[in-house]
Amino acid sequence: MGIKLFKPTTPSRRNMSANTFEEITTDKPEKSLLVSLKRTGGRNSQGKITVRHRGGGAKRKYRIIDFKRDKDGIPAKVATIEYDPNRTAFIALVVYTDGEKRYIIAPQGLKVGDVIVSGPDADIKAGNCLPIKNIPVGTFVHNIELASGKGAQLVRSAGGSAQLMAKEGNYATIKLPSGETRYVRIECRATIGTVSNVKHEIMSIGKAGRKRKMGFRPTVRGSAMNPCDHPHGGGEGRTPIGMSSPVTPWGKPALGYKTRKTKKYSDRLIIKRKND
């Protein structure tokens, strides 16, 4: 993939960059795998804002992605590589030999015409999905399950890959992109390779309008508000926030305050936290 850099014809264009989408082969998605996506604008069923800075954006349809990869032993041929507005990674439309069509997260290097397969007997090749117990130690994987048969939950975004570090007993040790090292059951499935669109993280949005088209509204600083709207608000001119450490709009500690439960069930499965 390539990154397009724009000439500084306007102030917003100066540091703007965009994807060239060289891997994309079609702009027409498979209609049978599309469903309507209702926008909430960050509101709950009572109409109250529960997630700030959401709203607007371009209309989009949701692409049904096969995260389970449970069609074992049946080869599938890659028909197209497509853009998905709902995620940072590209997706691939695969057609099985029995005629069924499914979308999968496209790994880096997957091309139209490639054949992929799922199941314990699959080869160690990008795009193939196997139980972790059948994957060699040291292999880079993505789309990792946390519970067998539930579907992939880890390492699904653009450019992501985890490394299989060890296998012992019923558990495998996996190093995640965040730096966290944790145990995963060896019956859980993972897909070989790295997620596509690896240069996504170095792209610069460049201007506010592109962010609005993505469905994000502006984030206003608390110190720019009135005291009735935020604990940091008020004061004459540009004043400090007037407290020892920053807080959220609701008065809870912010920036550095640990929000993870101290006795979470998965603590025993995490060997090394990403911040350690």
UniProtKB/Swiss-Prot annotation:
GO terms for molecular function: rRNA binding; structural constituent of ribosome; transferase activity. Residues 218-255 are annotated as: Disordered. InterPro entries: NA-bd_OB-fold, Rib_uL2_dom2, Ribosomal_uL2, Ribosomal_uL2_bac/org-type, Ribosomal_uL2_C, Ribosomal_uL2_CS, Ribosomal_uL2_dom3, Ribosomal_uL2_RNA-bd_dom. One of its GO terms (biological process) is cytoplasmic translation. Keywords: Ribonucleoprotein, Ribosomal protein, RNA-binding, rRNA-binding. Pfam families: Ribosomal_L2, Ribosomal_L2_C. The keyword RNA-binding applies. GO terms for cellular component: large ribosomal subunit. Part of the 50S ribosomal subunit. Forms a bridge to the 30S subunit in the 70S ribosome. Belongs to the universal ribosomal protein uL2 family. One of the primary rRNA binding proteins. Required for association of the 30S and 50S subunits to form the 70S ribosome, for tRNA binding and peptide bond formation. It has been suggested to have peptidyltransferase activity; this is somewhat controversial. Makes several contacts with the 16S rRNA in the 70S ribosome. This is Large ribosomal subunit protein uL2. It comes from Clostridium tetani (strain Massachusetts / E88).
